[in-house]
UniProtKB/Swiss-Prot annotation:
Disulfide bonds join 31-81, 40-64, 56-77. It comes from Bungarus candidus (Malayan krait). It is found in: Secreted. Beta-bungarotoxin is a presynaptic neurotoxin of the venom. The B chain is homologous to venom basic protease inhibitors but has no protease inhibitor activity and is non-toxic. Coiled coil: none annotated. SMART domains: KU (SM00131). This is Kunitz-type serine protease inhibitor homolog beta-bungarotoxin B3 chain.
Length: 85
């Protein structure tokens, strides 16, 4: 095999190794819980993962710390709860 072929093979194996962990990641179990909408402190805008729609949705979070399915931003929600297949 030529040195160019070996470099190509090495590059493909490296790419595969880098992408494999991301593609098999599962979401956190808290992402399947309903949002806690009780009011305990100041109400702030937050996001929760809605499994039936497979997306993050904005809601009013009252600071009760009911479960882990509340995030300060849509980006954080998506990073934690979206599955990568």
């Amino acid at each position: 095999m030529s040195s160019g072929g070996l470099l190509l093979l090495l590059g493909l194996l490296t790419l595969w190794a880098e992408l494999t962990p991301v593609s098999s990641r599962k979401r956190h179990p808290d992402c399947d819980k309903p949002p806690d909408t009780r009011i305990c402190q100041t109400v702030v805008r937050a996001f929760y993962y809605k499994p039936s729609e497979k997306r993050c949705v904005q809601f009013r979070y009252g600071g009760c710390k009911g479960n882990g399915n509340h995030f300060k931003s849509d980006h954080l929600c998506r990073c934690e709860c979206l599955e990568y297949r």
